[in-house]
């Protein structure tokens, strides 16, 4: 039986990014994915690189800033390796804060009503609006590009094969058992997102947090002039994400609903109405589709990054709503840790061992 240097459990944006990074450092890498790569939380995500969000936990601030800085180069590499154009937009975000809230993000500025009307004439909301110098990306294209880039670098993949157990001998990980087979490796990395805690031994406390979204499109297809709005818009009720082809995404709920991915029509109507309240011209667009995804939550709402109590078994999960944002820096830091280098940023606050 072939033995790999590393097995990555889970082929989402985190697993793919890490696999690609480890392969570039000379490791022989296998991704084992329960369904198809980049088709769960990655596929369902909005793709905001919300690096200026004032509600980012303090413990994450350095990782968030570093990852956002890496994004343009990260995307350029993926485009070069995959041959697919990734829709990375840099128009920025218009965010509505609570009374008295301010942004301390470099380059952020408060918007007057006149300036807001000039930069987004279709946006009718007024209030404590700020411009934030953030990026956004189409995660579905990003996921496809990551799959192709990983294959380009020589990462092996097994799909349609859920991992049920991490194999161990002599106090260390030796591979994984799936519902269909076994695979051997010198180390195992659990990047299974919301499903990470379902893999035995059950020492990774993740849970699914449901999010529903809806996509609207112009009647008759996308306008030649591009999207109706240029900026991502974040209000207390909804976030509105334009794509370069004219689609607009509206999201997203935060629901403790287990592994249920049912789309609720009333919820979708409320999201759509919140979008129309902000951008009335959106009422002339039609609903294209709606979906639900499962984010990986943790007890303290921080990612789980590091080696578990089983030698050679690493957890890289629990990114909650920030998996797309944190993918580049997570891949860099965990590749450094796994290959015996000192990570450029401190990962101790995210250690799996913090849960006892």
Residues of each region from the PLM?
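Active-site substrate-recognition segment that forms the wall
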Residues: 20-24, 47-49, 84-89, 172, ...
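Helical element adjacent to the flavin cofactor pocket in flavoenzyme catalytic cores
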Residues: 130-179, 183-187, 191
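N-terminal Rossmann-like FAD-binding beta1-loop-alpha1 element of flavoenzymes
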Residues: 4-31
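Glycine-rich FAD pyrophosphate-binding loop
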Residues: 23-45
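Helix-loop-beta segment of a Rossmann-like dinucleotide-binding subdomain
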Residues: 84-95, 107-153, 253-258, 312, ...
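Dinucleotide-binding Rossmann-like beta1-alpha1 core, especially the glycine-rich loop
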Residues: 47-119, 125-127, 274-276
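C-terminal catalytic lobe of FAD-dependent flavoproteins
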Residues: 139, 279-356
């Amino acid at each position: 039986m072939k033995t790999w240097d590393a097995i990555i459990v889970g082929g989402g944006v985190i697993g793919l990014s890490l696999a690609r990074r480890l392969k570039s450092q000379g490791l022989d890498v296998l991704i084992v994915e329960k369904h198809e790569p980049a088709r769960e939380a990655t596929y369902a995500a909005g793709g905001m690189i919300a690096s200026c969000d004032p509600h980012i936990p303090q413990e994450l601030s350095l990782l968030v800033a570093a990852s956002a800085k890496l994004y343009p180069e990260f995307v350029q590499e993926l485009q070069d390796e995959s041959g697919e154009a990734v829709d990375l937009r840099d128009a920025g975000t218009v965010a509505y804060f609570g009374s008295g809230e301010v942004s301390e993000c470099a380059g952020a500025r408060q918007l007057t009503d006149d300036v807001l009307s000039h930069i987004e004439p279709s946006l009718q909301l007024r209030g404590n609006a700020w411009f934030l110098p953030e990026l956004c990306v189409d995660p579905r294209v990003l996921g496809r590009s990551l799959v192709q880039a990983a294959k380009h670098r020589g990462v092996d993949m097994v799909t349609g094969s859920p991992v049920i157990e991490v194999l161990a001998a002599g106090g260390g990980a030796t591979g994984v058992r799936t519902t269909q087979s076994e695979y051997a490796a010198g180390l195992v990395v659990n990047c299974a997102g919301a499903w990470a805690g379902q893999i035995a031994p059950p020492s990774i406390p993740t849970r699914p947090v449901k999010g529903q979204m809806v996509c609207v499109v112009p009647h008759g297809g996308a306008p030649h002039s591009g999207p109706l709005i240029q900026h991502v818009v974040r209000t207390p009720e909804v976030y509105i994400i334009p794509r370069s082809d004219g689609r607009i995404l509206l999201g997203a709920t935060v629901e403790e609903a287990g592994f249920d991915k049912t789309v609720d029509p009333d919820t979708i109507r409320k999201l759509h109405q919140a979008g129309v309240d902000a951008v009335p011209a959106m009422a002339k667009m039609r609903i294209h589709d709606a979906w639900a995804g499962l984010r990986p939550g943790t007890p303290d709402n921080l990612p789980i990054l590091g080696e578990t109590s089983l030698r050679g078994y690493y957890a890289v999960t629990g990114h909650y709503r920030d998996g797309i944002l944190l993918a580049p820096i997570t891949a860099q830091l965990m590749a450094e840790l796994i290959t015996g280098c000192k990570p450029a940023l401190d990962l101790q606050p995210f250690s799996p061992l913090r849960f006892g």
